[in-house]
Amino acid sequence: MITNSLQKTKVKICGIKDLEIAKICKEEGADYIGFNFVSSSPRKIELSNAQKIVEYYKSEKNSPEIVLLFYQNSFEEIESITSVLDHDLVQWVWDDPLINRKKLLYKRQICSYRVQTQIHDQDLKDIEAEFLILDSYSKGVGGGTGETFNWELISKVKRKFLLAGGLDPSNVVNAIEIVKPFGVDVASGVESSPGIKDPQKVIQFIRNVKSTS
């Protein structure tokens, strides 16, 4: 993907569960944070905790945009959460068998596409989303595996996307230099254990990304 050299690489920190980490994301200049509502994920956030973060962000200037992540959730569950929790975007997974794409058309969307083979823009033409997340594939898991994939498989994609899959503070600069994505997305790569964000890793990841812009 060829990006505008003057454009700053966007940063999304996914799987935020507590206010402390949310504050760090804002202070360090993250562009997006993700609330995970996948029932099987160690990163699933309680609605009450999500509300606290939303209220804090609403009281502050220049807060990150809030993304609500769903995978194998019923539409009723998605609707019940999105109707009571202020947010900016909804993130869904392209091969999620439960997703009703038509019912999401009125929302700002991010689609997570899990890469298995070489893909081109033509392969992605039917995906209606503000931008994509190109992530590693793992059967039955919607993301957050901590596994990278062969970036050559997306070398022909010019559509706007966030690169995900196995990124961490030690490799994100190299990933940006090679892939030149619109932005990067991280979950497990800034954790001390599954679902537990490490403040220093979050800080270092964001600063490393910002250093490339």
Curated annotation (Swiss-Prot):
<dbReference type="InterPro" id="IPR001240">
    <property type="entry name" value="PRAI_dom"/>
</dbReference>
<dbReference type="InterPro" id="IPR011060">
    <property type="entry name" value="RibuloseP-bd_barrel"/>
</dbReference>
<keyword id="KW-0822">Tryptophan biosynthesis</keyword>
<keyword id="KW-0028">Amino-acid biosynthesis</keyword>
<dbReference type="InterPro" id="IPR013785">
    <property type="entry name" value="Aldolase_TIM"/>
</dbReference>
<keyword id="KW-0057">Aromatic amino acid biosynthesis</keyword>
<comment type="similarity">
    <text>Belongs to the TrpF family.</text>
</comment>
<dbReference type="GO" id="GO:0000162">
    <property type="term" value="P:L-tryptophan biosynthetic process"/>
</dbReference>
<dbReference type="Pfam" id="PF00697">
    <property type="entry name" value="PRAI"/>
</dbReference>
<dbReference type="GO" id="GO:0004640">
    <property type="term" value="F:phosphoribosylanthranilate isomerase activity"/>
</dbReference>
<comment type="pathway">
    <text>Amino-acid biosynthesis; L-tryptophan biosynthesis; L-tryptophan from chorismate: step 3/5.</text>
</comment>
<dbReference type="InterPro" id="IPR044643">
    <property type="entry name" value="TrpF_fam"/>
</dbReference>
<keyword id="KW-0413">Isomerase</keyword>
<protein>
    <recommendedName>
        <fullName>N-(5'-phosphoribosyl)anthranilate isomerase</fullName>
        <ecNumber>5.3.1.24</ecNumber>
    </recommendedName>
</protein>
